Amino acid sequence: MMPFCHNIINISCVKNNWSNDVRASLYSLMVLIILTTLVGNLIVIVSISHFKELHTPTNWLIHSMATVDFLPGCLVMPYSMVRSAEHCWYFGEVFCKIHTSTDIMLSSASIFHLSFISIDRYYAVCDPLRYKAKINILVICVMIFISWSVPAVFAFGMIFLELNFKGAEEIYYKHVHCRGGCSVFFSKISGVLTFMTSFYIPGSIMLCVYYRIYLIAKEQARLINDANQKLQIGLEMKNGISQSKERKAVKTLGIVMGVFLICWCPFFICTVMDPFLHYIIPPTLNDVLIWFGYLNSTFNPMVYAFFYPWFRKALKMMLFGKIFQKDSSRCKLFLELSS
């Protein structure tokens, strides 16, 4: 007999008939992803919060993004894990809307943060003399507010007003909606709107800004090289070191952006294309793409650990319990702060 998610069979979603071994493997993999996401981003949050040397405008923006990446491990992934492994939703229709809204909000907020970080890096590399005047703590607070509020209004407004399936109500209620399910469904209009708002527009801004930074940094490197060849070694070497550090930061954040695009691009492309293809993408594939997107929140701290020496030193201090020592917050994580 085919398993169902609800007692009333004629309105119930169909439960998958995977073996217990398959389910156990899926749960183990997803628990590992969740724990890695939580621990990695928590280390970033604690590091920036604890060490006073890291209290810079850019790092507070990174702190906020780490919080955005941390929250899916608490609020989204555990419930998505059950839905993916069982193909059933046991938490009620209201919580389904809350879960879906939170999921969309946090994924959108992550790329909003990356967009603002790219702008921050643009001024740090391309206009360093006026960087601290232009990107002060007030500007960072505005960036953080926009990065959280706009995705929240967009996601919760769309889901709770049921605008996500507006124009495709007949398809949704006849072929998708069932008791014990929590499918992420978009009509043609809402799919395009979500793609543009959460992915394409902010992603395009990032790509354009980083390309502009690359061109300017490349030109700066050429000028510094020419100046050094004219024996202006003292001052120019200092400027060269500073610009080298900025370019390294740009490269690191560019990799973070690239990881985001690689992780979320398949999901957003399917989201915008599926309604025009008459919803041919199976739910299982959609689940896989969603979890592939979640991996973005898992990978970001790994990028920090690989490229940021201050992150590795902070991690060592945490592992050995040194952050509990007196005045540990004033510990020097590096000799010279970058912007």
Curated annotation (Swiss-Prot):
Disulfide links within the chain: 5-178, 13-88, 96-182
Principal location: membrane
Say if the entry is tagged with keyword Disulfide bond: yes
Q: Where are the transmembrane segments?
A: 26-46, 60-80, 99-119, 137-157, 189-209, 253-273, 288-308
* Stored SMART domains: 7TM_GPCR_Srsx
Instruction: Give the record's membrane topology.
Output: Multi-pass membrane protein
- Subcellular location per the Swiss-Prot or TrEMBL entry: Endomembrane system; Endoplasmic reticulum membrane; Cell membrane
* GO cellular component terms, semicolon-separated: endoplasmic reticulum membrane; plasma membrane
Where do the record's glycosylation annotations fall on this chain? 10, 17
Q: Which SUPFAM superfamilies match?
A: Family A G protein-coupled receptor-like
Query: Topological domains (Extracellular): residue ranges?
Result: 1-25, 81-98, 158-188, 274-287
Q: Which InterPro entries match?
A: GPCR_Rhodpsn, GPCR_Rhodpsn_7TM, TAAR, TAAR1, TAAR_fam
Which keywords does this Swiss-Prot/TrEMBL entry list? Cell membrane, Disulfide bond, Endoplasmic reticulum, G-protein coupled receptor, Glycoprotein, Membrane, Receptor, Transducer, Transmembrane, Transmembrane helix
- Sites where the protein binds 2-phenylethylamine: 103
* Listed GO biological process terms: G protein-coupled receptor signaling pathway
Q: Which residues lie on this side of the membrane: Cytoplasmic?
A: 47-59, 120-136, 210-252, 309-339
* Pfam families assigned: 7tm_1 (PF00001)
A GO term, aspect molecular function: trace-amine receptor activity
Q: What does this protein do?
A: Intracellular G-protein coupled receptor for trace amines, which recognizes endogenous amine-containing metabolites such as beta-phenylethylamine (beta-PEA), 3-iodothyronamine (T1AM), isoamylamine (IAA), cadaverine (CAD), cyclohexylamine (CHA), p-tyramine (p-TYR), trimethylamine (TMA), octopamine and tryptamine. Also functions as a receptor for various drugs and psychoactive substances, such as amphetamine and methamphetamine. Unresponsive to classical biogenic amines, such as epinephrine and histamine and only partially activated by dopamine and serotonin.
Family statement: Belongs to the G-protein coupled receptor 1 family.
User: What is the name listed in the Swiss-Prot or TrEMBL entry for this protein?
Assistant: Trace amine-associated receptor 1
